[in-house]
């Protein structure tokens, strides 16, 4: 859901999703995008996002984006802000503020953006560059978040960004392909080689977000631990 919202914000026109997860992390994502000038309408059965296009965010100076408890949101949105005209501060809750962010700010700095951290942690202040440059990045930790942040930065960067990433979740790659974003992926046993041509327009799109079994994991474990309990998981 977070990835859909971020990519929809980069498209041109109205994108619609159904089955959007209504969690705090996703709602914080929508709130952050609204602060960046994206129009969003949340209905009972769908969500509409009116994308601003590549490099199209419009916002006031020195805004603060609150990622709450979402490391996915905090790291991925940094990738979309490597071209930000004004300084943007990203904050989070007490738990998120204890986590390391250098592993994502370091590769994003290669695009030309500047990051100021609190000893590697939140808050993070971003000062983007008008002309981000394509990079070659090797990701050795198997972090889907770091890989995705660089992929999103590549969207706003003219030229070809090349990522050699240790095997990890491929949600971002699947969405890129679905949207027709110029991406080439070469799979090997341990690594994926990802090539992205940036600065290409993204058309608005309709998307039914797949259900995520991890959201049901808590109830599955609780049922397994409780005698005479039954759980029916649908969709």
Predicted regions and their residues:
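Structural preference for solvent-exposed beta-strand-turn elements
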Residues: 1-235
């Amino acid at each position: 859901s977070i990835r859909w919202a971020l990519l929809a914000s980069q498209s041109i026109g109205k994108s619609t999703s159904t089955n959007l997860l209504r969690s705090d992390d996703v709602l914080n994502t929508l709130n952050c995008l609204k602060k960046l000038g994206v129009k969003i309408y949340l209905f009972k059965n769908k969500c509409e996002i009116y994308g601003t296009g590549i490099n199209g965010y419009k916002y006031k100076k020195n805004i603060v984006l609150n990622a709450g408890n979402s490391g996915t949101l905090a790291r991925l949105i940094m990738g979309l802000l490597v071209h930000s005209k004004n300084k943007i501060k990203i904050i989070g809750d007490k738990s998120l503020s204890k986590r390391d962010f250098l592993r994502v700010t370091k590769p994003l700095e290669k695009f030309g953006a500047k990051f100021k951290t609190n000893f590697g942690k939140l808050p993070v202040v971003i000062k983007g560059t008008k002309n981000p440059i394509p990079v070659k990045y090797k990701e050795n930790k198997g972090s889907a978040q770091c890989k995705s942040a660089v992929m999103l930065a590549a969207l706003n960067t003219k030229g070809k960004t090349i990522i050699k990433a240790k095997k990890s979740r491929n949600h971002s790659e699947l969405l890129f392909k679905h949207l027709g974003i110029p991406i080439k992926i070469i799979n090997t046993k341990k690594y994926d080689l990802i090539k992205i041509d940036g600065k290409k327009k993204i058309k608005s799109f309709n998307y039914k977000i797949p259900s995520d079994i991890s959201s049901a994991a808590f109830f599955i474990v609780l049922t397994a631990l409780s005698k005479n309990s039954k759980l029916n998981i649908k969709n």
